[in-house]
A protein has these predicted regions:
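Acetyl-CoA-dependent GNAT
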Residues: 11-74, 79, 92, 98, ...
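Short acidic/glycine-enriched loop/turn segments that link adjacent beta-strands
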Residues: 46, 115-116, 135-140
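Conserved N-terminal entry element of GNAT/NAT acetyltransferase domains
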Residues: 1-19, 147-157
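Conserved acetyl-CoA-binding loop-helix of GNAT-fold acetyltransferases
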Residues: 84-97, 123
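A short, internal acetyl-CoA/4′-phosphopantetheine-binding micro-motif in the GNAT/acyltransferase core
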Residues: 76-83, 112
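Conserved GNAT acetyl-CoA-binding A-motif
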Residues: 99-112
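Conserved acetyl-CoA-binding loop of GNAT-fold acetyltransferases
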Residues: 2, 122-131
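Conserved catalytic-core motifs of GNAT/GCN5-like acyltransferases
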Residues: 108-110, 127-143
Length: 157
């Protein structure tokens, strides 16, 4: 029991996010950021979408976001018949260029722990920061980080 006269706080599950939740998060995260980082961080999500096309056909995509100076690559996928030709690497590099343009200093991603994934991401400047045993459907996943994000080549490929 709390001190006499303390407010009773009720917790409940709600079906939709009330507008005041966004206001609460913005206000309280700003206070938490100042306490933890000594600065206000911009938590606005800025989407990063890089596509590869062969004519009108979508051949691959890198999809993610930049939030508070950190890029997160959510999806990287190349059409099965287009794999093995360097397209995934080109998508990752352009994703990183765009993320840096939006203020990101580093890029984070999570993917299955396979030799192919490990080799690919290490070739593109990522290092392993965590292994997540049995993370998804019993399979291990790896978290990778690329820092610094910017590379010398900043053009379209």
């Amino acid at each position: 029991m709390g001190p006499e006269g303390a407010d009773v706080i009720a917790c409940r599950v709600v079906e939709a996010e009330p507008p005041e939740v966004r206001e609460f998060l913005a206000r309280e995260w700003a206070l938490a950021d100042r306490g933890l980082f000594g600065a206000d961080l911009d938590w606005t999500s800025r989407p990063v979408v890089v596509e590869a096309r062969a004519g009108r056909e979508l051949a691959g995509v890198a999809l993610g976001e930049v939030v508070a100076g950190m890029a997160r690559l959510h999806d990287l996928l190349v059409a099965e018949r287009r794999r093995g030709r360097g397209l995934g690497g080109r998508l990752v590099e352009l994703f990183c260029v765009r993320a840096a343009d939006l203020g990101a200093a580093r890029c984070f991603l999570r993917c299955p722990d396979t030799p192919r994934h490990r080799s690919f991401y290490e070739r593109h400047g990522f290092t392993t920061i965590a292994v997540l045993p049995r993370y998804y459907h019993g399979h291990d996943f790896v978290e990778y980080l690329r820092e610094p994000l910017a590379q010398e080549d900043r053009g379209e490929r």
